[in-house]
């Protein structure tokens, strides 16, 4: 009996300690507490899904309260209507819903109204779900949603109604033909005549970020870099045995084990002396390895391209020619960011950076893209792999503060140690344009090879 009582006391004590630990963790990461958030050392752990949601939900509310009305005023839209159906959501939907929701529930009609006068935008969910209290709910049955919408539009009587349809911006083209038809029918001719594309409002909403989100993104990037560092090490790679596909699938599995999301399949390619670009198969001493890798964490996507060198017996560093190629890639990064300034367009930055790079003797290709809620996110691209003369429409959009971008590019460089073989050095790092216009790497950039022992 005494043993049973003692065991019971131990169990109760452990349960209490566990509950206390969970409570402490929840408090530590709650942005609603008004306290600064300390992110965990990514070498020890990542945030649990519960901890992530405790951060993301208040950010969504703050974005609505501090950003949306100004964006609606800038784009001249009084009311923004975003219908989504389960498994056929608008691309904007995920940025407006908590991590506890993986899809729209049945049909959800989100409505945003700008009251003017510097007041926050009003927000409504027409249907049966308030999305964890983010939205005041205009309750209605499935068959009555459009009738409830019409009553709300009559009440607010907006001059301009925005919907997400666009030829140029995939992020702002979420309304289906059926949903638009039903919307127009419900609004009636007078209100339907007020409809215009909300494409630039959708782009503006998706591209601008809060300072708190940037802090979180830096943590996410550290986690992504850590996975790459681990993959490009002898923990994963045994030269002469491990294949590039082995590394690819190790990275994919590692993402799952960490509880992270993914938005594209990782890649690991090989550059080797005397062979055509990107041979596949067993990794050997003397190979240069390249990876393209990204994760989804706290609702944010990352995108990174790094390079490693497999040492030959007796080597302690990569050949000078390979290091010079990496340095040339760093120079192209500098030039790209130098010419991508606030209120300049992506096409202007592309033309100027390419011109200066060629003057300096580089063989460049630039194809940067915004990043954030999507991997290839809303905002101005700087070229594309097949658009080195400029990107139509989207490339004429300007850079704005508090936005994030993947600086993605490559240079082709001659490597003397490889018999003057031309080698492509591809790099990609995520960076933010700060409020004053200065660029800031999210978590530094690669300027030296990962070294793998033979």
Question: Language model features by range: what are they?
Answer:
Residues 1-4:
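Positively charged n-region of N-terminal signal peptides that target proteins for export
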Residues 6-16:
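Bacterial N-terminal signal peptides
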Residues 18-20:
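Sec/Tat signal peptide C-region and signal peptidase I cleavage site
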Residues 23-454:
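Active-site neighborhoods and metal-handling regions in enzymes and metal-associated proteins
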């Amino acid at each position: 009996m005494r043993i049973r009582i003692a065991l019971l006391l131990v169990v109760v004590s452990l349960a209490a300690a566990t509950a206390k630990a969970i409570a402490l963790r929840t408090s530590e990461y709650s942005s609603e507490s008004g306290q600064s958030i300390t992110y965990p050392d990514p070498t020890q752990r990542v945030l649990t899904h519960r901890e992530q949601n405790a951060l993301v939900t208040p950010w969504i509310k703050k974005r609505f309260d501090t950003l949306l009305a100004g964006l609606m005023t800038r784009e001249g839209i009084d009311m923004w209507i975003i219908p989504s159906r389960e498994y056929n959501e608008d691309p904007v939907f995920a940025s407006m819903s908590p991590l506890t929701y993986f899809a729209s529930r049945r049909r959800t009609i989100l409505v945003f109204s700008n009251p003017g006068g510097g007041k926050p935008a009003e927000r409504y969910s027409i249907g049966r779900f308030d999305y964890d209290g983010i939205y005041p709910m205009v309750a209605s049955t499935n068959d009555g949603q459009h009738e409830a919408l019409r009553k709300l539009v009559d009440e607010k009587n907006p001059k301009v109604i925005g919907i997400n349809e666009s030829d140029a911006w995939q992020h702002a083209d979420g309304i289906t033909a059926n949903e638009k038809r039903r919307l127009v029918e419900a609004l009636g001719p007078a209100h339907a005549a007020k409809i215009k594309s909300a494409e630039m409002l959708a782009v503006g909403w998706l591209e601008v970020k809060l300072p708190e989100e940037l802090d979180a993104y830096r943590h996410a990037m550290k986690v992504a870099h850590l996975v790459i560092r681990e993959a490009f090490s002898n923990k994963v790679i045994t030269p002469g045995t491990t294949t590039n596909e082995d590394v690819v699938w190790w990275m994919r599995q590692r993402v799952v084990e960490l509880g992270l999301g993914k938005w594209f399949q990782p890649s690991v390619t090989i550059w080797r002396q005397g062979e055509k670009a990107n041979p596949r198969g067993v990794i050997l001493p003397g190979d240069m390895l390249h990876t393209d890798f990204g994760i989804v964490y706290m609702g944010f996507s990352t995108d990174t391209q790094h390079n490693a060198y497999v040492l030959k017996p007796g080597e302690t560093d990569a050949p000078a020619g390979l290091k010079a190629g990496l340095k040339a890639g760093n120079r192209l990064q500098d030039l790209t960011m130098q010419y991508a300034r606030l209120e300049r367009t992506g096409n202007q930055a592309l033309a100027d950076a390419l011109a200066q790079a060629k003057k300096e003797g580089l063989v460049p290709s630039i194809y940067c893209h915004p990043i954030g809620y999507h991997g290839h996110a809303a905002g101005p691209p700087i070229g594309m792999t097949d658009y080195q003369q400029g990107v139509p429409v989207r490339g004429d959009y300007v850079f704005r503060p508090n936005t994030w971008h993947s600086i993605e590019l490559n240079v082709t460089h001659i490597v003397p140690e490889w018999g003057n073989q031309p080698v492509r050095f591809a790099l990609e790092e995520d960076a933010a344009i700060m409020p004053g216009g200065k660029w800031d790497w999210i978590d530094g950039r690669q300027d030296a090879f990962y070294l793998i022992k033979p």
